[in-house]
Amino acid sequence: MEELKKYLERDRYWQQHFLYPLLFQEYIYALAHIHNRGLNGSIFYESGEILGYDNKSSFILVKRLILRMYQQNFEIHSSNESHKNRFVGHNNPFFSKMIWGGFAVIVEIPFSLPSLIEEKKKEIPKSQNLRSIHSXFPFLXDQFSHLNYVSDIRIPYPIHLEILIQIIQSWIQDVPSLHLLRFFLYEYHNWNCFITLKKSLSIFAKGNPRLFWFLYNSYVSEYESVFCFLRKQSSYLLSTSYRNLIERTHFYGKMEHLAVVCCNCFHKTLQLFKDPCIHYVRYQGKSILASKGTYLLMKKWKCYLVNFWECHFSFWSQPYRIHINQLSNNSFDFLGYFSIVLINPLTVRXQMLEYSCLIDNTATKKFDTIVPIIPLIGSLSKAKFCNVSGHPISKPIWTDLSDSDIIDRFVRICRNLSHYHSGSSKKQSLYRMKYILRLSCARTLARKHKTTVRAFFQRLGSGFLEEFFAEEQKFLSLVLPGIPLASGSDRVYKERIWYLDIIRINDLVNYS
């Protein structure tokens, strides 16, 4: 507990008290422009074109926005007075996006400074391998084969606005910035009811992705700060890879009142969670909690999480959002793979002098990953590459492109999909995905040239679109140069291959 208090005292040093004046600096909006251009295109230029402005006038509009904000008085009014003194960008979506983007850059400052200082002090190597999504699977293969149960947790949302502001207040002590954030959230709540409607929440995330993820990560950080503390206190053996994973997936931040909460409320809880081996991984809106303990212990963790969300965040979390499965009997969805722990029975012959016997009760455990065929077909169906039963269809929206552009798009999608799911032990499903994309490409080209697929293949030959199935051959020539292609193909067909350059989930994997 003393170490936790010292850690919190150190974090308080980085609390920012003067963030609001940065909202009136032009370079803040330039930083937001550069970031959003890399993610969703330029919000300055695209919005300016929609509103009738050219590219050169975008920064003139920034100066005009700053002048208006100098004269703006941000106050929260009741619903009857909401039409008075409204947000400066309410009637202009271009101004609104600029302020959202600039404010997102400002509020990230208190979180980025401590992480940079910690990396500089500890000299953490900036290895791309640790940032790869596939780097988590070898860790799971080493640890999960010795575990018994896993809880598949869907992190509940959304959270109440005032609780969300209180969470951010522990890092940002600048009162004007907090008032401005409260004004933004309540204004958006009045316009779209983003607290109650999941569709409106997704619209908010698409329109303001950087600020949305900042708010969401702040909420998750509050939940994980207590959870990770309990996990460390309740474990006898800590994983050596735990910190490396957390440093790149966990959103930095501890709350001020964490020590008080743990002292007053959780000293009895620690006696219930004595687990020598427990692992926690979070990705997107889900998390995995695996343990070597019993089913009763996992039920206690489930009750704790439900009560914690209800008491600490003031909303009811349905128990069905947490599924407890036995690893040897059930698979769980993790980062686009179906993962399961397989039990392979072995028969061992033992011999002592002239006597021999067979021991058949020996078993080994193996962590296995396979491609989820049905969800992937659903993703291809949503993207209009096939129907719901997996029958390939044409892509009419791409028929205006050139033949080379159409082929290049299909090949790139197929290559990325094969690259991401190379860790599957059964690649029949992956070859079926390639077949769907290959035939969809042929149907799209045939639709463009107003002919049939059969006539199209007869004219171009049977070797047309062979690059869809050439990914394994390219891999063999680079990684396994000394192995013949025939035996190498069999090896790639059976072996799982993890790449260390994948830093984001494939779009077709986000089927849930």
Swiss-Prot record:
Quick check: keyword RNA-binding in the entry?
Answer: yes
Domain of life of the organism in this record? Eukaryota
Q: Which GO BP terms, alphabetically?
A: mRNA processing; RNA splicing; tRNA processing
Task: Mention any one GO cellular component term assigned to this protein in its UniProt record.
Answer: chloroplast
Keyword list, A-Z? Chloroplast, mRNA processing, Plastid, RNA-binding, tRNA processing
A Pfam match is: MatK_N
Q: What InterPro entries does UniProt report for this protein, alphabetically?
A: Domain_X, Maturase_MatK, Maturase_MatK_N
The GO terms this record gives for MF are: RNA binding
Q: Where in the cell is it found?
A: Plastid, Chloroplast
Q: Does the keyword Plastid apply?
A: yes
Q: What does this protein do?
A: Usually encoded in the trnK tRNA gene intron. Probably assists in splicing its own and other chloroplast group II introns.
Q: Belongs to which family?
A: Belongs to the intron maturase 2 family. MatK subfamily.
Q: What's the name of the protein?
A: Maturase K
Q: Which organism is it from?
A: Alisma canaliculatum (Water plantain)
User: In the UniProt record, what gene is named as encoding this protein?
Assistant: matK
